[in-house]
Amino acid sequence: LEIASAWFSTFLTTKPIEETVEEFIKHRDFLHGMGAKVIVVSEQGHSIQGLMDVPLFKNKPVFTEEEWEKLADGLHHLGKLAQEKGLHIVYHHHMGTGVQTTTEIEKLMDMTDPALVSLLFDTGHLVFSGEEPLYILKKYLPRIKHVHLKDIRQEVVDVVKEKELSFLQAVKNGAFTVPGDGVIVFDEVFTILANSNYQGWFVVEAEQDPALANPFEYALKARKFIQEKAGL
């Protein structure tokens, strides 16, 4: 049994960096002790992903230039701390945060050192946001050190936009599902990664109501799909 990683929330845009650093070191040391190779980080300053009644698309946060600078500088510092223990930070672009869209991902990648800040590639969050995942995958392939395989139920996403629902409401309504159960075509994703030097994890994610989608059945469905499509 091996650990893939564990989420870490940064607040580099809204709080003193010392607060994030103090918590990050504890998290880093735990993951190092567990044998992980990467640390998933996501900036939660101004994030609305955990707010039940705030419309996801209407109220998405947008960073100021000063906040972008704080984020980039802070991530460089965390990247160095991670490397002290032989780990890498992988940045998780995420719905309801200041790094969600293609433009925002590109800005973050442009502002950060590839040697210190890697990227987590999440199919579900990119498609949910309306982005083209293959564009991000191809452009930043050398910087991608962690992959989340997540599918989308487009009909639920359409309702989220129409009714101005929050991220949590979207999840509860089934916006996400396992690979092969939604609208995302994974064939080229697997092909590109197979033909690259990618050595990281494929993490299957599908946050949804277990009363509606039996976790064991959906885990088997995802496993079968990946085996058939990727040969893994």
Where are the predicted features?
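Active-site acidic/histidine proton-transfer and metal-coordination neighborhood
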Residues: P16-L119
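Hydrophobic faces of well-ordered beta-strands that scaffold small-molecule active sites
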Residues: I3-F8, I39-V41, I89-Y91, V117-F121, ...
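Short amphipathic alpha-helical segments at helix-loop
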Residues: L12, N59-F63, V90, V171-G174, ...
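N-terminal entry module detector
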Residues: L1-K26, L232
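Active-site beta-loop-alpha junctions enriched in small/polar residues
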Residues: F8-T13, Q44-H46, H94-G96, D122-L126, ...
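Histidine-acidic metal/acid-base catalytic patches
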Residues: K80, T102-S118, V127-L232
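A short alpha-helix capping/helix-coil boundary motif
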Residues: S5-F8, L56-N59, G86, F167-V171
